[in-house]
Structures are given as C-alpha cells and as structure tokens.
Amino acid sequence: MRTASIQRDTRETQIKLSLNLDGAGKADIATGCGFLDHMLELFARHGDFDLSVTCRGDTQVDYHHSVEDVGICLGKAFQEALGDKRGIVRYGQFLLPMDETLVLCACDLSGRDYLGWAVDLPAAKVGDFDTELAKEFWLGFVRNCPGSIHIRQLAGENTHHILEAVFKGMGRTLKEAVSLDPGHAGEIPSTKGLL
C-alpha cells in the first residue's frame, strides 16, 4: 500500500496527517480553518486519496502557519508514499471548469521543485481565509514533494470558485501523476534512472 503518516510539531502548529494514495476519496479534516478543510475535502475526493488531517495552530495570529504547514505535511506524505516513484505515470494535467471559472493544473513529479502560479484572486478574503495563503499552501507542498507544478487560471471572477477549481484540479492532476503505469510496472519513469 502506498501510504504515509506525518507528524509535525513546532511552536506554531501541531499536525497529524495520514494519506493513502490508493484510497476512495475519504476525508477527515480538522485544521481549525473551515475554508482549508473544505478545499482539502475536495482535493481528496477528486484525487481519490484517503486523507486525514488534524492541525492545532496559532490561529489567534492568523491562518498562515496552519495553511503553510499543512501544505508541507501533505507534500512530505506524498513523497513518503511514492517512495522511489517506481512504476508511476509521473505526469498529470487537468483542465477544470467550474461555472465561470477555468483552471489548468499540470505537474511533473521530477524531484525538482517549481511552482508556476498564474492565479488572479479578485478578493483578498473568502470568509476569514486570506486568499494569498493558497499559493503558500502549494509552495509548501512542492518544496516537500519536489516536482514542477503549474496552476494557471484561464477564466474566473468568483474567488471561491477559482480556489475550488485549483484544489479540485490539483486532486485530479496528482491522481493521474501518481497512478501506476501498467506498461512500465516497476520502472523508474526517467532515462536517468532516478527521480
């Protein structure tokens, strides 16, 4: 089974996260930030990942540390669950429409971290969530599960819809990238022989 459990304790956050890449989209999320919980539930459902997250953070300050650190832990969990990445497809992409919004997500689980973020969020907040933290989440993820991730908004006016499309699209994208390639079972998907 391709699973991982991560625990991270700092002065700012205490996080427990478990991930099953070959799950059924079951989510049990309690980060202390309702909007992040919603996004992670969508991510898990659309990626068919079983994901459990609990986070106690310094939310009396704001959600920055909690959001970034959950992204870090999710990246670490993907990296651990993938191991040497033997047999995976490696690449994934998805074009996700949601009402007026259209978001393109693509990734290469190459071992080299890069985030291409071309997302224009009209509102600074959705509820009490600072929308700029979505980028911090994905930066935390890609720095701990190194790969190239590109997230590009092609259309959209409603900030909630845009962010929802990002998290759903990344769930679908990573589902494809981590899926097992039956034509190359047991092979590292690189001419270099490692990722």
Feature roles, as predicted:
Residues M1-L195:
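Structural preference for solvent-exposed beta-strand-turn elements
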